Amino acid sequence: METNKNVIFFGNGLNRVSEGLDWEELLRKISHGQILKDIPLTFQYEDICLSRDAEIFDKGPSCSVGEDKLKEVIADELSVIHGNDVYEALAKLPVKHYITTNYDMTLESTLKKMGYHKIQSDSNESRYSIHRYSIFEKDNDTKQIWHIHGNIDKRNSII
């Protein structure tokens, strides 16, 4: 592979390799097992957020306070994910841009362990993640990571 001509797109499957939580497990844990079956995970998230039965999340007629609490719990659960051999192999690829739907910072942690340091980031967006990225560098090799669904460092960005 030639450097900087390729992009890697990845999601939670990398975390599942090392027995990290998948979305269904995470939502089941957060909702104390009360998720709806046979509906997409996105709707399960909304159901937990809006549920009258999930009293710790539902704080009124709108979802916003409940959703903030839900995002906080998701971020706390995902902050304990550790890297694995797949992340190390991914970080060693001659690729500049990594696009991820993951909220966790596992690739960033892996890069730091490999001697990379953060040289730039843009996380000015408070709600969405269109321009949210971090750049890491080691020996003139740069890696730019885009969290397109938000990240646990900016919990409100989680979508």
PLM region spans:
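Conserved subregion of the PPM/PP2C metallophosphatase catalytic domain
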Residues: 108-112
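Active-site gating loop/helix substructures
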Residues: 117-159
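Gly/serine-rich nucleotide phosphate-binding loop at the start of the catalytic core
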Residues: 1-91, 96-99, 107, 117
